[in-house]
């Protein structure tokens, strides 16, 4: 995903982004490190905050069955 890149481009700290989204800083760290996939609601909130489309921030890969 491109969360860290977008956050830094806007001069935001992880704590500031977490506060703006109503989540913990640890959640932001996990998102940026790709260890956590956000709910659709959180992904939508992140996209709205950055003024971008969800698919421009997140890279969705289909899992093989």
Feature annotation, model-predicted:
Residues 12-30:
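Short alpha-helical DNA-recognition segment
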């Amino acid at each position: 995903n491109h969360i860290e890149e977008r956050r830094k481009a806007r001069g935001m700290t992880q704590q500031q982004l977490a506060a703006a989204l109503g989540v913990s800083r640890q959640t932001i760290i996990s998102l940026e490190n790709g260890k956590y996939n956000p709910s659709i609601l959180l992904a939508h909130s992140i996209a709205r905050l950055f003024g971008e489309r969800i698919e421009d921030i997140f890279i969705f890969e289909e899992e093989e069955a």
